[in-house]
Regions:
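S-adenosyl-L-methionine/SAH cofactor-binding core of RNA-modifying enzymes
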Residues: 3-82, 125
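Conserved small/polar residues in nucleotide/adenosyl-binding loops
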Residues: 210-218
């Protein structure tokens, strides 16, 4: 809104210049998260779009374990006035809620970020205080999950959308956005690996070839 980088931001950052200097500006969530393999969306209200929900404590535990095993983790925070839209949330693997007074469930973005970072730092310090864990980190672990990243999933959704559009699956233009969100939610709940995506791409290619051959025969 005010442009970035912005010199005005450094004074209230109270010396955290390194953090600000590493901050990057992106024009879309898909662009910002394309290398992320486990994405969480913070939300104050219960969603009905099918995305799995975790408490902040479970989310931090799961995210830290993923990082230790070589994955990339991201947390999405929405605008203070409106929060994340359903289209934003459906791009995440999980939604995260912070347990606070239900009558005052809205936090400003700095408070939400602080709480997530505080819980993350707590589990990190506990982990690093165990010498056995330090040895484990230094051993260059093999990824236990090899989850696909958001960028790869976005490409898959684009290909799938093309196939479903050609086949006439979206019979109602009004309902198409809702159906697409539901499809994303369905696949995101499956925690797709790179191998899963390769298999799904193979299925899509086969279907596209079939429909193309059928059209030629006609």
């Amino acid at each position: 809104r005010d442009g970035w980088p912005n010199d005005v931001a450094f004074a209230p950052a109270a010396g955290a210049d390194d953090v600000l200097k590493q901050a990057k500006l992106y024009h879309s969530i898909s662009e910002a998260t394309k290398t992320i393999s486990l994405l969480f969306a913070t939300t104050a209200r219960k969603r009905v779009i099918g995305t799995k929900s975790l408490s902040i404590f479970k989310a931090i535990e799961k995210s830290f374990e993923h990082v230790v095993n070589g994955g990339n983790v991201g947390f999405l925070f929405g605008p203070e006035q409106s929060g994340l839209s359903n289209d934003d949330v459906v791009q995440a693997d999980y939604t995260v809620s912070i347990p606070i007074n239900k009558e005052f469930s809205s936090l400003n973005i700095s408070q939400a970020v602080l709480l997530i970072c505080w819980e993350w730092n707590k589990i990190k310090m506990s982990f690093l205080n165990d010498d056995k864990n330090l040895v484990k980190i230094n051993k260059k672990l093999k990824k236990s999950t090899e989850l696909s990243n958001v960028g790869d999933r976005e490409y898959f959704y684009k290909q799938l959308d093309e196939l479903l559009t050609k086949s006439g699956f979206f019979y109602s233009s009004e309902m198409a956005p809702v159906v697409k969100r539901n499809i994303r939610s369905l696949f995101n709940r499956a925690s797709l690996t790179h191998q899963d995506l390769r298999t799904l791409h193979g299925i899509i290619r086969s279907c596209l070839l079939y429909t193309s051959d059928a059209a030629d025969d006609d």
